[in-house]
Amino acid sequence: MESMKQLKNHNVDLISNNDPLDKNRLLIEDLWESVLREECPNDQANRLMKLKELSYCNQVEEDISRTFKNEIVDIVNSMDLAESISAARAFSLYFQLVNILEQRVEEDRYIQSFTNKNNQKSHDNLDPFAPALARQNAPVTFRELFYRLRKLNVPPGKLEELLQEMDIRLVFTAHPTEIVRHTIRHKQTRVANLLQKIQVEKFLTVEDIKSLKIQLKEEIRLWWRTDELHQFKPSVIDEVDYALHYFQQVLFNAMPQLRGRISSALTENYPDVQMPTESFCTFGSWVGSDRDGNPSVTPEITWRTACYQRKLMLERYISATSNLRDQLSVSMQWSQVSSSLLESLETDRVQFPEIYEARATRYRSEPYRLKLSYILEKLRLTKERNNLLAEAGWKFSLERESDNKNIELVEKLHYRSVDEFTYDLELIKNSLNSTDLTCEAVSKLLTQVHIFGFSLASLDIRQESTRHSDAIQELTNYLELPKKYDQMPEIERIEWLKDELNTKRPLIPAEVSWTKSTEETFSVFKMVKRLQEEFGSRICHSYVISMSHSASDLLEVLLLAKEMGLIDQSSQKSKLLVVPLFETVEDLKRAPEVMEQLFQLDFYRSLLPKVGERFKPIQELMLGYSDSNKDSGFLSSNWEIHRAQIALQNLSSKNNILLRLFHGRGGSVGRGGGPAYQAILAQPSGTLKGRIKITEQGEVLASKYSLPELALYNLETVTTAVIQNSLVINRLDATPEWNDLMTRLAETSRIQYRKLVHENPNLLTFFQEVTPIEEISKLQISSRPARRKKGAKDLSSLRAIPWVFGWTQSRFLLPSWFGVGTALSVELKSDPEQIELLRVLHQRWPFFRMLISKVEMTLSKVDLEVAKYYVDTLGSKENAKSFGDIFDVISKEYNLTKSLVLEITGKNKLLESDRDLRLSVNLRNKTIIPLGFLQVSLLRRLRDQTRQPPISEFLNERNESERAYSRSELLRGALLTINGIAAGMRNTG
């Protein structure tokens, strides 16, 4: 067997000394090996290196060598429990280091794109529209995009109109939760920063480089001695803290930079075009407000989340204002000051005499510093008041409690709204401008205030539709309606709900004891009203109804909102935007009919918020990728979502209503994930119009927002794609022949998928036995249960996230591709000439190209050799025949799909046209093999113990204690392999 160094040399065709990724990968691997040799016993370290060498052998060979695979299995099976855990930790560490390295390289390449400012000629032939659009794989910068638009003679007025209407909303979610501990994330950031310093080695001395490598090794050794697993199940507030970390550390400062890059690109290419508003891109969050299937998210938790968000923003503003006070040392002896600012100082002196006494002498000739001292005091008081409210809870109001011992704090002048804070900052900015001075820090802070306000991110409430209908059912039972609500057909329900919405009479009687579920449903609406009273409507104005099936689902929420004071009947205005979430394929097909029923109701239209210069009503509508995929498979899900968007946009236009589509995309392809740029470009032409809302799932937050330039890259990618798609007149989506073909493909794919997943009685048992789904549920990574209903074991109760997670761990990745091959094959059997049409679609239609690209990428990660090992080793003997049949179906579909995808793309290998991605996937595919075999070994031992009779029948008390500890450690080892494979595959669910 060759040594690792010899194997690295044998792999020279894949490594370029000039490629920073390859160069630094060798550095990372050397450090990884060095740390393991220092931290592990010598024979154990040798076996780990042997596993790594065998992985390299597999990487060099085109196909997995059975000899090498058997050697890996032999080594894994020879390991005792402690060594297995060390091996799982070692390979998990390796993949996390590789992930850091790839992120750093992505960040550097993005930065380099700004240094190639004069290389415009290379872009001249790249047409962002029509057929050439589909051939663009790499995202573009603002500068590149505006340059191309100018070359294509896109009128400045058309671009400006779009920019002024642009409304991009990115919504952070907790689930699927990031599997890596927050503690480990901090270590990863430090490693990334050290790598960044090493990468500029041409500016460093030999001693500097040596010192940095020593620091890097020290950090990795500390990491090795840190527990990777969460020690406790995170609370919802823990999840809130995790998500808000990215706002604190990265996004707060990144957003003004994003705006600056747009400004620079416009000045260069469209100097007369007005900038978009500061809030063209804002943020939302479901963390702490998404209560669908999560009983831990209570009204109190949502209230605490809002207070926590405001606390973080106030702390950032206090810090920024303090820095401004240090900077703005302008003296009245050398500069004029606006009369408005001087008048405000006089008002502040009266309202804050203690600040005047403390600061007036020091700042008697420095008005900006004095003004900022008053601002700091107001911010401090606002923060103290916020802390009191967080402790008191949502049912408590400081203003209403006259006996509150801290009432004197309220009587002082805190900021009652972010507008008051903005006004004070504008006074400073305008005064500086009036004397021909500017201050970038003031402008930056104002931009941050416009984007984040005091609330940081809007909290979307989400709840499942039956919770509302159950509450109204209980209410109407109490009221003794002539006909029970649940017995009314849909038309009757709509009429009854409409009548109740139009009456001023209260429906819900006071002082009635409701069931716990109904009482909490009512309390959510009461809490939202209190939130808006305290924070303003910005904090919480969207209510997402998951599993929306009918018009009554939306009207029920509106009725509850009306009863809790969230609808002003006199003005016909609602303080809550009701957002249906259509998730299953059948619901997606029915969505246009449901919305048309609602749009025909005058009172419903009047309740829609009005936006834009034309003051038109807007409807937000969410499309679910996860459950539609789990329901009908990848191809059917994507096509029905595509068709629904077109139908809904046509319906909205007909009714003179604006549409904002909310895409519930996950991190994995099986849940709508994939490159954001290609996904947005593939949206049907005419459906965006500058407006889009997208979920940013917990598992992808680190890969997108952990580093400043990565965050800017992602934000710029999304924005340029929205601009590009919105300005495209792409008539390819309306090609009848293409639509008919896609409809046939989607239906055939759906039938094949459902035949395996929903109609095969052995599939659920197969999934439970040959994937680590049960062990995944024991990972302490999420506050939300893996199943919608407690105790349920059926497929319908299993959430889409663990469904995808389980298939990914066992290397099937089935939800992301199964059924595609059969659909293509059936079409080509009926007409072999269709292959040419499919190739045309791949070349010219962004939607179809995106589909094939996602399938191709997913297929490249599938490893049926490893998957078969899961089946053979973990499957029970009594199910061997049925499991073998299922595997044969999956294997046949995989080979069929792979061959037809290659036939459509015209390539010989998967990912042949994307070298960087191919090398990354190949590296991971081979190096992850030992982890898969380790996982199987640990799962087998764990499950064997679990299946044995009660231990007390055979062992004394002492041995029982040892046996229990061993079972716990086996689970720990299995969970560590789950961590490692998730890092290697770069996603969970």
From Swiss-Prot:
Keywords, sorted A to Z: Carbon dioxide fixation, Lyase, Magnesium
Active-site annotation: 175, 630
Entry GO MF terms: magnesium ion binding; phosphoenolpyruvate carboxylase activity
Catalytic activity, reaction form: oxaloacetate + phosphate = phosphoenolpyruvate + hydrogencarbonate
SUPFAM superfamilies, A to Z: Phosphoenolpyruvate/pyruvate domain
Pfam family, one: PEPcase
Any GO BP annotation: tricarboxylic acid cycle
GO cellular component: cytosol
Keyword Lyase attributed: yes
PANTHER family on file: PHOSPHOENOLPYRUVATE CARBOXYLASE
Family: Belongs to the PEPCase type 1 family.
Name assigned to this protein: Phosphoenolpyruvate carboxylase
Originating species: Prochlorococcus marinus (strain MIT 9515)
